[in-house]
Every structure is written in C-alpha cells, then in structure tokens.
C-alpha cells in the first residue's frame, strides 16, 4: 500500500515538474537542442526521462549502444522497432550499413526526423507506423512526461501509464512482414512498451532470418499491455536462437534455461531493457 502511494506521489510530482518547465519556456517551445554524446538531438523539454537525461547528463543509453555495436559490423542491416527520437538509432547508424526505424508516436517521429537531419544521417529510413500482428488501426496514448513510454492503449490502463493525462489517438499499425519490402536484418531491436508480443506476431518471416534479437522484457507490460504470459512471449522467439543474455543480471543461458530465469524475474517483477537472443 505504501509503495503504491509512493509511486503515485512520484508520478504526480513529475507531472507538475513537466508542466512547470512548459510554463517557463512557453507553449511555443516544442523542442530544445542538446549537443550530447549520442549526437545533436532535439528533445521535448517536457520529457523527464530520455530528454531529461540527455539535457542533464549529456548522454543516454551508452552501455546499450556499446553492446549493440559489439554485435554489428559496417555491413550489418539493423531494424529498430521503437526508435523514439533517435538517441540510439543515430549512434548505431554510424557503425552499420543501414537502419530501418519504426516509430508510432507522431510527435516522437517528428523529432526523429529532425535529429536525423541535424546529424546528417543518411543511412536510416523511417516509418511513422505501429508494428502489430496485422494491418489495423489501434488506440495509442502519447505520453509527455515520458514520451518514450507512449504505447498502445493498455488492456489494463494502470495509473503509471496515464498519470500525465496522455492524448489518445488512432495510429495505423501493420504486420512488418507485410509492410516492409525488405526482410533481411542482421540485428533487430524491439522496444515498444508492451507491444513487443504483437509486433513479433507480425514479423515471423523477418525474425526467422536475423542473427540477433534484442527485446524489452517488463513484467507489468506483459501483464497490463499485452495480457500474455512469459510462455506465450517466448513462444514467438525463433528456434534458431540458442542463447539468451540478460544484461541486467550479467548472465547468459541456453534459451530453455533462460526461460526459467525469465519466469522467476516475472514472478519477482524484475525487468530488463533489452534481452539479447543470439544463435
């Protein structure tokens, strides 16, 4: 009870802080430009997660970028599902042949487009769609305080997903197997706030050909957004992957043993920003 109250107060204070920044800068200020280690990036000043870290610390996700760069070469083709504003895409693009980037949130997509231009990144193609199991129109909520947390309308829309009163819009979604002309990627990164399950349902062909899959794993997303079990989630991981690395635990296991570890993590409400499946 006390823990839940703590988080509600925390979310409330974040929302107030974001609104205060917006008032101080004025409604006409849609982005500020940060010269960061990730690149020259336009960020929403109201964003207190990725945007805040870029503004305050001058970087975001450098450890993850290093891990990804160790898994690709200058000849690699990479698919990023959930590109946000490009803080990972832009540095990764410097070390591979090509990146295809998917971003469903139109506000984030506009910043992504701006940031590619600011960094003169020419080997990234971007698509303002949602990845799903089929072609459909989905309800999508656009968070401001944590714009990277924007997501498909959860089946169980907990307070933690809606504390900043996100606008809910219609977004066109597609099976990536059907939408993308290209289906050969060396590395695929999926981080779409609980919709990973639906995306993987619609990209069986693409997944079957990749060498490395990195996918977010958060128990509350599996439960509230997708409403699926760990077993259902893992059923979509192609069988040619034999190893699972869990960066948050600094552990690598055979996939079958890794599945047991993930179930334990789910039971303990422990997540990981990017599980790594490899051959």
Describe each region flagged by the PLM:
Residues 56-79, 121, 125, 137-139, ...:
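Short internal loop-to-helix segment that lines adenine-nucleotide cofactor pockets
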Residues 130-133, 175:
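Conserved acidic residues
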Residues 136-146:
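Polar, low-complexity loop segments and adjacent catalytic/binding residues used for recognizing
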Residues 125-127, 245:
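General small-molecule cofactor/ligand-binding pocket signal
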Residues 81, 102, 190, 215-216:
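Active-site flanking residues adjacent to catalytic metal/cofactor-binding acidic residues
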Residues 210-218:
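Conserved beta-strand signature within the Rossmann-like core of class I S-adenosyl-L-methionine
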Residues 1-119, 156, 161-165, 179-181, ...:
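S-adenosyl-L-methionine
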């Amino acid at each position: 009870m006390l823990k839940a109250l703590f988080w509600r107060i925390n979310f409330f204070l974040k929302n107030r802080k974001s609104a205060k920044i917006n008032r101080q800068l004025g409604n006409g200020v849609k982005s500020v430009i940060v010269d960061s280690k990730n690149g020259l990036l336009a960020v929403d000043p109201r964003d207190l997660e990725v945007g805040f870290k870029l503004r305050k610390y001058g970087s975001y996700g450098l450890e993850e970028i290093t891990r990804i760069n160790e898994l690709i070469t200058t000849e690699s083709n990479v698919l990023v599902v959930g590109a946000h504003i490009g803080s990972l895409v832009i540095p990764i693009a410097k070390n591979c042949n090509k990146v295809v980037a998917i971003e469903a949130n139109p506000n984030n997509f506009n910043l992504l487009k701006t940031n590619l231009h600011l960094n003169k990144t020419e080997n990234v193609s971007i698509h303002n769609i949602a990845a799903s199991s089929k072609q459909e129109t989905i309800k999508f909520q656009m968070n401001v305080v944590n714009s990277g947390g924007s997501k498909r309308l959860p089946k169980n829309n907990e307070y933690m997903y809606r504390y900043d009163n996100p606008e809910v819009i219609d977004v066109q979604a597609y099976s990536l197997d059907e939408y993308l002309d290209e289906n050969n990627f060396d590395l695929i990164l999926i981080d779409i706030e609980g919709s990973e399950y639906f995306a993987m349902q619609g990209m069986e062909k693409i997944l079957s050909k990749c060498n490395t899959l990195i996918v977010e794993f958060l128990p509350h997303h599996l439960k509230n957004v997708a409403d699926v079990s760990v077993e259902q989630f893992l059923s979509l991981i192609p069988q040619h992957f034999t190893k699972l690395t869990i960066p948050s635990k600094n552990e690598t296991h055979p996939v079958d043993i890794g599945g047991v570890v993930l179930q334990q993590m789910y039971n303990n409400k422990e997540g990981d920003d990017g599980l790594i499946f490899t051959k």
